[in-house]
Regions:
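Divalent metal-coordination and catalytic microenvironments
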Residues: 26, 43, 48, 69, ...
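Short coil/turn connectors at secondary-structure junctions
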Residues: 17-19, 60-62, 68, 140-143, ...
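Histidine-rich, glycine-flanked metal-binding segment
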Residues: 4-21, 27-74
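Histidine-centered catalytic micro-motifs
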Residues: 75-86
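Hydrophobic alpha-helical hairpins/lids featuring a short glycine-rich hinge
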Residues: 115-150
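Active-site gating loops and adjacent loop-to-helix segments of metal-dependent hydrolytic enzymes
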Residues: 87-126, 169
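Metal-coordinating catalytic core of metallo-dependent amide/deamination hydrolases
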Residues: 12, 151-218
Length: 218
């Protein structure tokens, strides 16, 4: 059901090659000295790339987004996010990373979140967390994310994480980190995931491997 809702609310053809969008008439802050800023300017997007920034851009075949009275600027980049934990964002606010042996730190991130809450996640829970986390970040102006994904308890969990990240419609890097349990296929499932979801490096969602593969035992 969440997938159906996502498909029905995102703009048609989002990020697809050849789809042109003109953001028109906004106050453009390019953050690039070579491009400059415009009190009233336009931004032309072709597929997933910005191809022109300037005043009075002619692009008659484009979908037009009227930006008069608004600021147009590059989105923020989040370099480290665990999107599968979106619904847990208020949990363990005062916890430390790992158990240091002190009684007051018995409730720590690794044991409580990764070894506790995440173990009962179903694939549909992963998808909803990924999708909602992505949409919420878009609403806050974050248009690119490095998703440190540690929820690979089964191939179905992995698929749900990727599809939720992708379906939010923004640029994202899927970080394939660990999972636990008898059905976990980490890291050997990486070949299937790469072939099924990341056959091209020139797409909105791309893949990197997690650092655990360099730890003895993997």
């Amino acid at each position: 059901r969440a997938q159906e809702v996502a498909a029905s609310t995102l703009p048609e053809g989002l990020g697809t090659p050849g789809r042109r969008v003109l953001i028109k008439g906004g106050a453009v802050l390019s953050m690039d000295d070579a491009v400059g800023n415009f009190a009233v300017g336009d931004v032309l997007i072709d597929g997933k790339r910005i191809v022109e920034v300037g005043a009075n851009i002619e692009a008659g075949d484009s979908v037009v987004i009227e930006a008069t009275g608004k600021i147009v600027m590059p989105g923020f980049v989040d370099t480290h996010h665990h999107q599968f934990e979106t619904a847990l964002r208020s949990q363990l606010a005062n916890g430390i990373l790992i158990n240091d042996g002190l009684p007051e730190n018995a409730a720590n991130y690794y044991e409580t979140i990764l070894q506790g809450f995440s173990q009962v996640y179903r694939p549909e829970d992963v998808y909803i967390n990924e999708l909602f986390g992505g949409i919420a970040q878009l609403d806050a102006g974050v248009t690119t994310v490095m998703d440190v994904s540690q929820i690979h308890h089964s191939p179905e969990h992995s698929d749900a994480a990727i599809e939720g990240l992708r379906d939010a419609g923004r640029r994202g890097v899927f970080g394939y980190f660990e999972g636990w349990g008898e059905r976990s296929k980490y890291p050997t499932d990486a070949a299937r995931i790469k072939q099924q979801y990341f056959s091209s490096d020139d797409q909105l969602t791309t893949m990197v491997m997690g650092g655990e593969i360099y730890v003895p035992g993997y």
